């Protein structure tokens, strides 16, 4: 049976880009390394590990090989050691422009070069020894202050971001990391950027860009003056403090942002737990009690719904649905059936969830009719970043079409209407399907797309034609897939 996974810290994976805009690559053949790749794929992903000896050095492990980067005394570099040795220890020296310098700890030389001419033999730092850190994780997450154990969220009333939330509940807890001029910005759900003085601004100006630093698997954000973001004062306002070295106060975890949804029943009222433990369709507005965290089990593809009151929906006696379970079990798992703009939910007793005359939900139906259909709306992705098997979705230069194999990503705006979503891109143009299934991004009118949450962290997008959007060898986004699998699934 699946285990609870409400708070999953993301493993920080990244690529290293040299001055020639090429990624450090670990090859399977001969365990050689080069800097020839133009984009961030499987062979270009690295994981930072702390030195087992508790020193200041770190280890670079290839994500796909599981082997460690090493530098010998004569400067030769490879990625062949499956257990870290002395030559695998590097010091990371952050530079003022946000880039890293990697120095061999035992030999004191600097690592760099171009294409297949990489070495760790330089005695001085030149542009060839400078590396840009490019995160390989999905850039939308929750940010948890390590010292306060509180989540960062946007406080509209105070016009600030603060680390004061017990739970990352609602859309205001979503943070999007924006890669900008070799640094990262923190973008709130309303598209503003956090400046180091705590103010929120509409443009990614210099004081809203941060260098990433890693310490014991945690993240720190250094501003252009060399100070670090931290929660400040009783309210936990996020701004740059006085410290020029990261302590526990300046460290953060990135946690996976699971989809949070609201559901509307046939009576056009929101499903809620506001009036007690019974899950009922009896509210006219969507607030915390009407929001549910939805998790999909990777094995069964069934889902759970977790409420703001701290309980999972669970099947109880006589088919009732209550938000009282504290652990995931068979009775908390629901199978989703996709019916165009609506969904049906089948409980563990094999029956469909329906709305009774008093508004309460119960799994007592053998067939799907009007009372068994619900509108499901994703509320915590007003900004949408999509990543497929080959990379991120991004506007194609000089074209109205969309690439699906990029290392960088575009942030799209999402709106919702009657069970369907509308996607708006750069310049305010809407997505629409053109000839032969091509997806274009300069529409004057919004076209409806259906979202189907098929796997944990992945969705399928269905066009009006009934076909699913997919990537592929051409690198173009097309609406021509028959099934929501493989290239037609998107991390969001």
UniProtKB/Swiss-Prot annotation:
GO annotation (BP), single: actin cytoskeleton organization
Main subcellular localisation: cytoplasm
Signal peptide span: none
Subcellular location: Cytoplasm, Cytoskeleton; Cell projection, Stereocilium
Tissue localization of expression: Expressed in the inner ear. Abundant in the utricle.
Pfam families (alphabetical): Fascin
Coiled coil: none
Classification via InterPro entries: Actin-crosslinking (IPR008999), Fascin (IPR010431), Fascin-like_dom (IPR022768), Fascin_metazoans (IPR024703)
A single GO cellular-component term on record: stereocilium
Superkingdom of source: Eukaryota
GO molecular function, one term: actin binding
Entry keyword set: Actin-binding, Cell projection, Cytoplasm, Cytoskeleton
Function recorded in the entry: Acts as an actin bundling protein. May play a pivotal role in photoreceptor cell-specific events, such as disk morphogenesis. Important for maintaining functional hair-cell bundles in the inner ear. May stiffen the longer stereocilia of hair-cell bundles in the inner ear enabling better force transmission to tip links.
Disease: Defects in Fscn2 lead to hair-cell degeneration in the inner ear and are a key contributor to the early-onset, age-related hearing loss (prebycusis) phenotype when in combination with waltzer cadherin 23 mutant.
Family as reported in the entry's similarity comment: Belongs to the fascin family.
Name used for this protein in its record: Fascin-2
Organism from which the protein derives: Mus musculus (Mouse)
Lineage summary: Eukaryota, Metazoa, Chordata, Craniata, Vertebrata
């Amino acid at each position: 049976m699946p285990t609870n996974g409400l708070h999953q810290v993301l493993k920080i994976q990244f690529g290293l880009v040299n001055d020639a805009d090429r990624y450090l690559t670990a090859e399977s053949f001969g365990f050689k390394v080069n800097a020839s790749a133009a984009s961030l794929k499987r062979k270009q992903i690295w994981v930072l590990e702390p030195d087992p000896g508790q020193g200041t050095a770190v280890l670079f492990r290839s994500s796909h090989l599981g082997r460690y980067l090493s530098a010998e005394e004569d400067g030769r570099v490879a990625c062949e050691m499956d257990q870290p040795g002395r030559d695998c220890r590097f010091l990371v020296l952050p530079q003022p422009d946000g880039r890293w310098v990697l120095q061999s700890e035992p030999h004191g030389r600097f690592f760099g070069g171009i294409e297949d001419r990489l070495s760790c033999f330089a005695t001085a730092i030149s542009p060839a020894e400078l590396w840009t850190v490019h995160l390989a994780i999905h850039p939308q997450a929750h940010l948890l202050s390590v010292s306060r154990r509180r989540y960062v969220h946007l406080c509209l009333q105070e016009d600030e971001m603060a680390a004061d939330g017990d739970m990352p509940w609602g859309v205001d807890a979503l943070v999007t990391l924006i890669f900008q001029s070799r640094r990262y910005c923190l973008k709130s759900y309303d598209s503003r950027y956090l400046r180091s003085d705590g103010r929120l601004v509409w443009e990614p100006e210099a004081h809203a860009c941060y260098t990433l630093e890693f310490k014991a698997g945690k993240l720190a954000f250094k501003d252009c003056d060399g100070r670090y973001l931290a929660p400040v004062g009783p309210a936990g306002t996020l701004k740059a403090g006085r410290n020029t070295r990261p302590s526990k106060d300046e460290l953060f975890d990135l946690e996976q942002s699971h989809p949070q949804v609201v559901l509307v029943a046939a009576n056009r009222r929101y499903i809620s737990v506001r009036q007690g433990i019974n899950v009922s369709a009896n509210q006219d507005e969507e607030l915390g009690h009407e929001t549910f965290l939805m998790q999909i089990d990777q094995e069964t593809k069934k889902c759970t719904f977790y409420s703001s009151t701290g309980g999972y929906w669970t099947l109880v006696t006589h088919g009732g649905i209550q938000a009282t379970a504290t652990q995931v079990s068979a009775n908390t798992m629901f199978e989703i059936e996709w019916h165009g703009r609506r969904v049906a939910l089948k409980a563990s007793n094999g029956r469909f969830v329906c709305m009774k005359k008093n508004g309460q939900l119960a799994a007592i139906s053998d067939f799907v009719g009007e009372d068994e259909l619900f509108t499901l709306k994703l509320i915590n992705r007003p900004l949408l970043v999509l990543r497929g098997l080959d990379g991120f979705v991004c506007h194609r230069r000089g074209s109205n079409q969309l690439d699906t194999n990029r290392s960088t990503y575009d942030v799209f705006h999402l709106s919702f209407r009657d069970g369907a979503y509308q996607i708006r891109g750069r310049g305010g143009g809407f997505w629409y399907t053109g000839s032969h299934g091509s997806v274009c991004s300069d529409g004057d009118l919004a076209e409806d797309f259906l979202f189907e949450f098929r796997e944990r962290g992945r969705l399928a997008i269905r066009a009006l034609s009934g076909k699913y959007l997919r990537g592929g060898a051409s690198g173009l986004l097309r609406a021509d897939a028959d099934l929501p699998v493989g290239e037609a699934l998107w991390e969001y």
